[in-house]
Amino acid sequence: GTFVYDCPEPASEPQEILKNMDTPESRTKVLEAEVNSVKEYLASLSNDDLQRPSACVDWSVADVLAHLAGQDHAPRVRRGLQGDYSPEEGSPAVADHDEDQFAKNIFNRALSTREQHGDQLLSYLAQRLDEVVEVFNSVGPNDWDNLCYWPPGPMAVWTLLDQRIAELTMHTWDVRSVL
């Protein structure tokens, strides 16, 4: 037989989508829309849903959501906007970056965030998502290239914005794909 992929027409032309994402300010609107969608989705999750395995190997849905909640994008961007891209207290110097330790820290921070917030994890995540939208909406037109601390090396504010969109999209899929 013949395989036919029936795909509805896109809501807008691909070029229009690209044009709409060509500035950090427009990508901030993408982040805001994604955050609103994710928060609406989170409100539909049950405690049983949170205990299920996610698409991330050895991580439950709650672990993935705790990972998203435990990321420190907003404070790092705030500091970067003030010209400070040095490591926060307790964070390693860029010169001392170890990728294996970085991965372990991500894992441990997710578990710690999950344990710390327990039954309030979803509301904490929603709060953190609102915080990151607020900080990116506060970036002035000449501040997108400001550097922010990132363990492997300083990153521009706009890079952290793109990273946050990618992380949120990817990890939301990790959850939605199994529920």
What are these regions (language model features)?
Residues 17-26, 73-138, 142-143:
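Short, helix-capping/interhelical loops that line the mouth of catalytic, cofactor-
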Residues 27-34, 121-128, 160-164:
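Amphipathic alpha-helix face/heptad-repeat signature
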Residues 34-37, 41, 71, 128-131, ...:
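Amphipathic, well-ordered alpha-helical segments in soluble domains
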Residues 43-54, 130-160:
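Acidic interhelical loop/turn segments
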Residues 51-97, 149-179:
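Short, contiguous alpha-helical
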